[in-house]
């Protein structure tokens, strides 16, 4: 196992409901990547954008070689095939690790899943299968999964997928909420890359903003 290597997999919603947040999403993602390029240790990045289908724009690319995402890659459209995106990514990364030499397997693997709506278009995977896959990777290999959801009950949805409450958070699907997401995720990645246990406080800024502004709206 390669101690200073971290596998980071981003599964990002680009379905039609994300319309209007393209610039915020692109800017937040790029700022996070630039910050992580300066962090110690090695990291491989995979980025899957999903709507009706999944598109892989980075497949285990050295983080220092990641070029800024643009609106050519992140253009919103279609429905929300979330389960297909998660299941396909787990299957791919799991196979890579399975057949890699011991010294090529990352010490840490983190999936970051962001969606702003309900699953409504998957055909290859269902929630039971995805839950089984996530629980297997967590228990056997220590993989971590973060779930950030807007316009849904993110904590309850994450539970259906085998992701614990302390790894799930509700956020506001707007400019402020999107920025906080990427800032918090970057801190979580830094913690994981350093080998420190991930604190449940990783989501505190997102949660505080969500509760404050939800109260204002109510």
List the predicted regions and their residue ranges.
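Acidic, low-complexity intrinsically disordered regions
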Residues: 1-218
């Amino acid at each position: 196992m390669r101690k200073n290597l971290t596998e980071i997999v981003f599964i990002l919603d680009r379905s039609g409901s994300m319309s209007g947040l393209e610039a915020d999403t692109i800017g937040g993602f790029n700022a996070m990547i630039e910050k992580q390029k300066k962090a110690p240790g090695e990291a491989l990045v995979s980025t899957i954008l999903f709507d009706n289908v999944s598109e892989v724009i980075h497949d285990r690319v050295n983080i220092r070689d990641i070029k800024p995402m643009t609106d050519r890659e992140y253009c919103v459209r279609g429905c929300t095939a979330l389960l297909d995106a998660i299941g396909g990514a787990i299957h791919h990364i799991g196979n890579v690790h399975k057949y890699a030499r011991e010294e090529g397997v990352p010490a840490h693997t983190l999936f970051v899943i962001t969606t702003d709506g309900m699953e409504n278009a998957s055909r290859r995977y269902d929630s039971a299968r995805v839950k089984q896959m996530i629980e297997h990777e967590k228990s056997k290999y220590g993989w971590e999964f973060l779930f950030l959801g807007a316009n849904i009950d993110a904590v309850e949805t994450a539970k259906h997928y085998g992701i614990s409450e302390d790894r799930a958070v509700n956020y506001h699907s707007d400019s402020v909420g999107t920025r906080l997401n990427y800032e918090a995720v970057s801190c979580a990645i830094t913690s994981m890359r350093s080998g420190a246990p991930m604190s449940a406080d990783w989501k505190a800024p997102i949660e505080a903003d969500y509760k404050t502004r939800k109260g204002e709206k109510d």
